[in-house]
From Swiss-Prot:
Catalytic activity: RNA(n) + a ribonucleoside 5'-triphosphate = RNA(n+1) + diphosphate
Name of this protein: DNA-directed RNA polymerase subunit alpha
Record-linked SUPFAM superfamilies: C-terminal domain of RNA polymerase alpha subunit (SSF47789), Insert subdomain of RNA polymerase alpha subunit (SSF56553), RBP11-like subunits of RNA polymerase (SSF55257)
Comment text on domains: The N-terminal domain is essential for RNAP assembly and basal transcription, whereas the C-terminal domain is involved in interaction with transcriptional regulators and with upstream promoter elements.
RNA-binding listed as a keyword: no
Highest taxon, organism lineage: Bacteria
Gene3D superfamilies: 5' to 3' exonuclease, C-terminal subdomain (1.10.150.20), DNA-directed RNA polymerase, insert domain (2.170.120.12), RNA polymerase, RBP11-like subunit (3.30.1360.10)
UniProt region (Alpha C-terminal domain (alpha-CTD)), positions on chain: 248-329
Signal peptide from the UniProt entry: none
Role of this protein: DNA-dependent RNA polymerase catalyzes the transcription of DNA into RNA using the four ribonucleoside triphosphates as substrates.
Length: 329
């Protein structure tokens, strides 16, 4: 390893162990000493706070006016029911919210499979228990599910809503993150004669709405995008060569391939001559859904990937495309 004193080892993905459908262990090595904790902690925080997902945000239960009450014929009180509803693992395709309905009668458990929904909604854990009915009683409720990011307490949404919110519409603390548990461990690694290196092992469990490997990839992409701003600091050290602020965000000038979309989605965009991210963000959802072979699942994937980079569909870009790209389009 002569001559590499000032060079950093470049880590490589060593192994992805799929423990089950919702849990995986990702091993990354070799890392310079100390970088195991640096990268592990950063990825852990992003996975817990920044992964987009879907969650229950509002519930209306027939005969219930507030959460500090109970319903006749139901074993659980309303607070327990709301807590159980937070455990629903749901995905929505092609839109940002959906209304689900539940009606059940007769003694026995009420589970997620009893919920009625349209084809745009998928409930990943249909056996999840919501409550238990006793005797010949019934329960009916309407459940609002929304797409979001991070954790949004009900109190925060209550402050922004109008005072005319109907009595009986119960707000739920929404945890949108599909990552249920994340932990990392740093072990010793060796390359040739060096024994002071790190091996990073990330152990992650999701709620089933996202593949653990995909979650790791998205979190790493988010981290890399955020660090781009620090890379650009080198331009500030050359005041004599100070240039005007670029007309467009550099990310808009990147090819669509950098989004690492599925093959189906990428091919659909290429067929529509959407070559750059700047081309893509100017399209609306309606326009993309008119694209042959591009369905709601692909649309949802595109929206999530753009959201992870602080972008969205339907943006307006004046003077697009720039001269540097005009010849290529």
């Amino acid at each position: 390893m002569q001559g590499s004193v000032t060079e950093f080892l470049k880590p490589r993905l060593v192994d992805i162990e799929q423990v089950n459908s919702t849990r995986a262990k990702v091993t990354l090595e070799p890392l310079e000493r100390g970088f195991g904790h640096t990268l592990g902690n950063a990825l852990r925080r992003i996975l817990l706070s920044s992964m987009p997902g879907c969650a229950v945000t509002e519930v209306e239960i027939d005969g219930v006016l507030h959460e500090y009450s109970s319903k006749e014929g139901v074993q659980e009180d309303i607070l327990e029911i709301l807590l159980n509803l937070k455990g629903l693992a749901v995905t929505i395709e092609g839109k940002d919210e959906a209304m689900l309905t539940l009606s059940k009668s007769g003694a026995g458990p009420v589970i997620a499979a009893d919920i009625t929904h349209d084809g745009d909604v998928t409930i990943v854990n249909p056996d999840h228990i919501i409550c238990h009915l006793t005797g010949n009683n019934d329960i009916s409720m309407r459940i609002r599910v929304e797409r979001g990011r991070g954790y949004v307490p009900a109190s925060a949404r209550a402050q922004t809503e109008d005072d005319d919110r109907p009595i009986g519409r119960l707000l739920v603390d929404a945890s949108f993150s599909p990552v249920a548990r994340i932990a990392y461990n740093v072990e010793a690694a060796r390359v040739e004669q060096r024994t002071d290196l790190d091996k990073l092992v990330i152990d992650m469990t999701t709620n089933g709405t996202i593949d653990p490997e995909e979650a790791i990839r998205r979190s790493a992409t988010i981290l890399a995008e955020q660090l781009d701003a620090f890379v650009e600091l080198r331009d500030v050290t050359e005041p004599e060569l100070k240039e005007e602020k670029p007309e467009f965000d550099p990310i808009l000038l990147r090819p669509v391939d950098d989004l690492e979309l599925t093959v189906r989605s990428a091919n659909c965009l290429k067929a529509e001559a959407i070559h750059y991210i700047g081309d893509l963000v100017q399209r609306t959802e309606v326009e993309l859904l008119k694209t042959p072979n591009l369905g709601k699942k692909s649309l949802t994937e595109i929206k999530d990937v753009l959201a992870s980079r602080g972008l969205s569909l339907g943006m307006r870009l004046e003077n697009w495309p720039p001269a540097s790209l005009a010849d290529d389009l």
